[in-house]
């Protein structure tokens, strides 16, 4: 049997129909504080684009630099390209992401893989004969 997703005991369908002020009470204090301080114009525009994409009006991929946007239930089922600092990475928004920031799903740094040290990198490598 497949487990149904619930956020704080509420199913996803109920979360979508819930008014925002009662939804905010379910979030942690950090997310609640961020949302009650107000949604900026850029965030409001992105939320509108996501709603249009869910309705089938938006044709272009949605790109954003807003990594501090909290995922709301009205955003689920849409792919958003989030900027990692170098490129836009696609993020498929699912119900498990509700209450988290978009930036949590796009890593901004990558693992460093060092190459072989060059000549003069250490004192002993000065005397290594060149090829």
UniProtKB/Swiss-Prot annotation:
SUPFAM superfamilies in alphabetical order: Ribosomal protein S19
GO biological process annotation, one example: translation
The entry's keywords: Ribonucleoprotein, Ribosomal protein, RNA-binding, rRNA-binding
Keyword rRNA-binding: yes
Keyword rRNA-binding attributed: yes
Record family assignment: Belongs to the universal ribosomal protein uS19 family.
Protein name: Small ribosomal subunit protein uS19
Species the sequence originates in: Cenarchaeum symbiosum (strain A)
Encoding gene per record: rps19
